[in-house]
């Protein structure tokens, strides 16, 4: 247990007054770990001068009685003390032992209450700051928040940015800054009847939330930016896990057609449809910016470039089109495929497209130039991954192929599936490829191994085709048309959890935070799972038309928002995109 504010010190350490204990009004986190206000006017940066300096320690405890009791000291006790002083150290210890043995428990408890505080030292203030930091480096973020409540000295040390960097706060910097999307822009796009969002924040509370959203950067951010990032990321994760959903909106478009593809980049959402168009939406305003018209067939695949300047689309009209995100203008029409363009992947300005014509093509989207054609598959190319150098493709010919994008040469053909390959995942740093097939299996490959030995794991358990996969470390999560989500350890080749709850094919998968996965399904629901525990956290969206044709076609997300493409193939549910907000401000 960390020392609290009732700690008493001798002359060699801080008194309770020196400690300046943090009051209830000062606390940033209460005992339940929830945020509270802090308003002591602390400095915006760490100041070593504010820390109490180290002082020499006393070797004797000051246990003298109060003045009033000194006047009434029993002469017999004075005589006993005089005798005690003449004893050697060993004899004094023997005397203590005998006295304790002869004492009753009431006296022993009183003696303990007098002695114990002298052993509760404020060690952080006595140590050099560097040693104090080294100790705090071993604590969790939650423990550091508790440390900050002990005293102002401890608070100053615990807010040094280097300590919070050791917790990996750098990864939290990818969270976009808080937005104003629920301060009014989403009010006119209310969720329609027939859609249930459990735990949605109540309208009366939403006004308070809107006010808080205007205060994007709080006092802690000014004082300790990395601590503030940690607290914000923790709040965002709690918003996903359990807190009421802070805001929601509906983007209506594409009439009664199917939304076939969807991507998010910063504040831009792009949807493609079998109505031959794409729509570019401003998320924060909740409105369409452009409708991209030009394809003469349904749009089946699209991408937003990493720089955010280009939107690329592939269609059943056999063309690839490059559009400007800035003004929605058509920049290039890339021709060459002789059948539907079914899949694509981008790295920088280089695009790779896969087609039912059995080929892949490599393009430069900035210039519109065709760079290479990759021949080798004997049936339609269904999925592709690209890291800027290596292309990985999966086809209806049951194979996975590895290509050099610069030379157009096939480096390796991975065989083992006995039906069509529908999904791929490629982690270039470890040369790992995961492939999902209509043969119900998932294979994990290391294409740097000798030919014929590339398959390092065969994951079996699903009973239909795998529609999506995500990998972190050795943990792979897969969603399948059999209505189940499975969590795998690819190193061991075993299924860790099977997540059951959907009543129809799972259409999409998104991984959030440390251990949360969201899945959408043809049953009209979006579910959030804890893959570490193998348990359902909660339903995020439920369509009343689910089970009668209403479905969630796909998901895409940022760390603070989820977009759900909704509709039906029998007109039981209007086509739309539902946006859910899980954002939090910097405290």
Swiss-Prot record:
Biased composition (Basic and acidic residues): 1-11
Consequence of gene loss (knockout): Worms show a weak masculinization phenotype. Moreover sel-10 mutants suppress the egg laying defective (egl) phenotype of the sel-12 mutants. RNAi-mediated knockdown results in increased zyg-1 expression at centrosomes.
Domain spans labelled F-box: 121-167
Biased composition (Acidic residues): 17-34
Gene Ontology molecular functions: protein homodimerization activity; protein kinase binding
Protein name per UniProt: F-box/WD repeat-containing protein sel-10
Keywords of this entry: Cell projection, Cytoplasm, Developmental protein, Differentiation, Repeat, Sexual differentiation, Ubl conjugation pathway, WD repeat
Residue stretches of biased makeup (Low complexity): 35-47
Name of one Pfam family that matches: WD40
SMART domains: FBOX, WD40
PANTHER family assigned to the protein according to its UniProt record, in alphabetical order: PHOSPHOLIPASE A-2-ACTIVATING PROTEIN
Quaternary structure note: Probable component of the SCF(sel-10) E3 ubiquitin-protein ligase complex which includes skr-1 and F-box domain-containing protein sel-10 as a substrate recognition component. Interacts with fem-1, fem-2, and fem-3. Interacts with the intracellular domain of glp-1 and sel-12. Interacts with lin-12. Interacts with skr-1. Interacts with zyg-1.
Region of interest (Disordered), ranges: 1-53
WD repeats by residue range: 253-291, 294-333, 336-373, 376-415, 416-455, 461-498, 501-539
Keyword Repeat: yes
GO cellular component, one term: cytoplasm
Effect of residue 567 to E: In n1074; masculinizing phenotype. Does not self-interact in vitro or bind to skr-1 protein
GO biological process: cell differentiation; female sex differentiation; negative regulation of centrosome duplication; negative regulation of Notch signaling pathway; regulation of Notch signaling pathway; regulation of protein stability; regulation of vulval development
Tissue specificity as recorded in UniProt: Expressed in tail and head neurons.
